[in-house]
């Protein structure tokens, strides 16, 4: 059995930029969640890219930047512009270009929009795009995407402190496992402000314990009790 390489080959199409990946993910998501307004206008597409919820990382991009990314996706045939409206509207062609079923497209979409996730998280997050019966069915489609030549997703080794492995898409190019794991650890790390608060709380508790110990020793001396005796017996 071959050992796991440090990086995985990207799809045959060129690697997407982070914003191209976000634009593609938004187009697929909104096709399912707001079908009445799909294909999307540039304004709606930009709003979807800058959405504060269900996005990782959160972006703040302009319509001009989104339009540049659309042009890049057009050259890859991953997106196209509709011709039935006076206002330019855009749609995706990912299923056709990559040759994947809707179930796999739903999983890729969530990975594009939310970053690395476990199979359980993906099942929950894809509910509005496709309802997977159980986690094993999610894993089956992920395994299929990972087994493609070239692979479209990769299963990351479990990072310290994690109970399950996360999956990551490969549409933005090769993934260095060390970098991906470091990113996962950073996400789970305690923020510096919270760490400082914990240190201050520990210091206060230590001082309070010292005051209580001094009070107990004082009362023991007043009552003629050997305080150390209780410590030894306990």
Swiss-Prot record:
SUPFAM superfamilies: Winged helix' DNA-binding domain (SSF46785). Pfam families: DUF480. Belongs to the UPF0502 family. HAMAP family: UPF0502. This is UPF0502 protein BTH_II0990. It comes from Burkholderia thailandensis (strain ATCC 700388 / DSM 13276 / CCUG 48851 / CIP 106301 / E264). The lineage of its organism: Bacteria, Pseudomonadati, Pseudomonadota, Betaproteobacteria, Burkholderiales.
């Amino acid at each position: 059995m071959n050992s796991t390489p440090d990086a995985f080959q990207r799809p045959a199409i060129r690697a997407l930029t982070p914003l191209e990946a976000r634009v593609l993910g938004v187009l697929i998501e909104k096709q399912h969640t707001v079908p009445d307004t799909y294909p999307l206008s540039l304004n709606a597409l930009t709003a979807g890219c800058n959405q504060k919820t269900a996005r990782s990382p959160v972006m703040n991009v302009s319509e001009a930047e989104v339009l540049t990314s659309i042009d890049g996706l057009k050259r890859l045939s991953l997106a196209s512009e509709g011709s039935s409206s006076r206002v330019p509207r855009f749609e995706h062609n990912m299923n056709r270009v990559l040759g994947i079923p809707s179930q796999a497209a739903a999983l890729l979409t969530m990975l594009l929009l939310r970053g690395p996730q476990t199979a359980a998280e993906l099942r929950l997050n894809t509910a509005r795009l496709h309802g997977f019966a159980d986690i094993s069915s999610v894993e089956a489609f992920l395994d299929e995407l990972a087994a493609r030549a070239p692979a479209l997703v990769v299963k990351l080794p479990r990072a310290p402190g994690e109970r399950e492995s996360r999956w990551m898409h490969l549409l933005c190019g090769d993934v260095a496992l060390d970098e991906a794991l470091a990113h996962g650890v950073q996400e789970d790390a305690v923020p510096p402000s919270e760490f400082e608060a914990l240190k201050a709380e520990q210091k206060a508790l230590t001082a309070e314990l010292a005051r209580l110990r001094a009070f107990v020793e004082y009362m023991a001396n007043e009552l003629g009790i050997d305080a150390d005796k209780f410590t030894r017996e306990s």
